[in-house]
Amino acid sequence: CYLGQTYLNGASYQGRLNETTQTGAELIGDDSSDGDAEMIVMVIDALKSTGLQEFQVELGQVEFYRGLVEEAGMDEETSNQLQELIENKNYFGVEELLTEQTMPEEQKRVFLKLPELFGDIEKIRLARSMTANKRSLQAIDRLERVQEILDSYGLGDYVSYDLGMLSKYSYYTGIIFKAYTYGTGEYLVTGGRYDKLLVQFGKNTPAVGFAIVVERLMLALSRQRIVTKVNRVEQMVLYEPGARTKAVGLAKHFRTEGQAVQLI
């Protein structure tokens, strides 16, 4: 887990802060769909703990798109252009770009459908019926497994799907997700799997994680008039180095009475 400042290299004059506070968590060394699900459970629990109830976590899978691109033999430049159009739900732009490409009409139809593949789990099942590409189907398998795990936690209703959500960050290698609520026009949480990123820092191990944008979360809480309970210190026990045992005993006494205690 971590908490710190992040600096974004975004476009100018958009009314957005270039410096934000983020808090989040990473699960390192686990490449399973169970690990994906655990991170999403943590996101949901974290948002609920602030008092939010009406929010959605949108799940995507970059490998579904990459499998289709690989099968179509599309070059990187065209793939990046198409990816941006799909993510922006620019149907006409997608159609225009595909008319310039040499590929079977069946493959073109799948790409044209991608901007529409958002909603509940039925959209994922529809996507499965649209392709026989092994890489893409493995991506669908992982999403369905994540849904099963979330359902077992009783949290399945908090998630939806968007196979047209394709991150501009190429280091993502599997599931990606963003959390939204009303009161802010931006995502509160962003995250995903990045199994090949840490090798650039000397550690070849899989990882999945997320970041909560604290300013956006606070804005949403304010606009929804949600007051978050803060645990304040009610008792402060000051002690000299040789009196630790006595101080700890006194702190335990206060805590059994339900009081928050800080030892100094």
Pin down the residues of each PLM region:
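Acidic, His- and aromatic-enriched active-site or binding-groove loops in soluble protein domains
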Residues: 73-96, 103, 155, 181
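Short, solvent-exposed helix-helix connector turns and helix-capping sites enriched
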Residues: 61, 89-90, 120
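Short, surface-exposed recognition loops or helix-turn segments adjacent to catalytic cores
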Residues: 54-64, 82, 160-164
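Short, conserved phosphate-binding/catalytic loop or strand-edge motifs used
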Residues: 18-23, 59-67
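Active-site-proximal loop/short-helix segments
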Residues: 68-69, 73, 118
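Positively charged, Gly/Ser-enriched RNA/tRNA-binding surfaces
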Residues: 2-52, 98-264
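Extended alpha-helical scaffolds
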Residues: 50, 64-65, 78
